[in-house]
A protein has these predicted regions:
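N-terminal leader/targeting pre-sequences
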Residues: 1-150
């Protein structure tokens, strides 16, 4: 795997609905064996105390817009091959809250950079159960960003 100190090929600036502190950056780095996806998210809803950290569904969606407040314009999960959830091309591991922040790095071979340009990245309010069809019962969309070439 290449070092991601190189510039990403694509990025998505994540924002919550107006007035929400949710923000972040998702970056996409081409690799020999797939795409390295990194996420740095801030302002997630969180609770303090033991066993209280939240888990959030995190996916690439097929739509090309992030219209607040519900981000329904992002469409459904991005899926190149007609697979069922959790095998959609856009199904990614969840984000784990740490005091309102989350960081993620994952290598995937489910898509190439050209496949996702103009698509959206969505953060959901609940964890993905990786079973319920068609989208994992991850709840409302609380953050969204459009993937653009960098």
């Amino acid at each position: 795997m290449q070092n991601n100190s190189q510039a990403p090929a694509a990025i998505a600036h994540i924002a919550g609905e107006p007035g929400s502190p949710l923000s972040g950056l998702v970056s996409f780095f081409p690799q020999e064996r797939g795409v390295l996806v990194t996420a740095q998210i801030h302002g997630l809803p969180h609770e303090d105390g033991p066993c209280a950290s939240r888990v959030f569904g995190f996916h690439i969606h097929e739509g090309d817009a992030c219209t607040p407040p519900d981000f329904e314009s992002a469409g459904g999960h991005f899926d190149l091959e007609g697979c069922e959830h959790p095998h959609h091309a856009g199904d990614l591991p969840p984000l784990f809250d740490c005091g309102g922040d989350a960081y993620l790095s994952v290598l995937t071979d489910r898509f190439a950079i050209p496949d996702i340009l103009g698509r959206t990245v969505v953060i959901h309010q609940d964890p993905d159960d990786f079973a319920t069809q068609p989208s994992g019962h991850a709840g409302a969309r609380i953050g969204c960003g459009v993937i653009r070439a960098f």
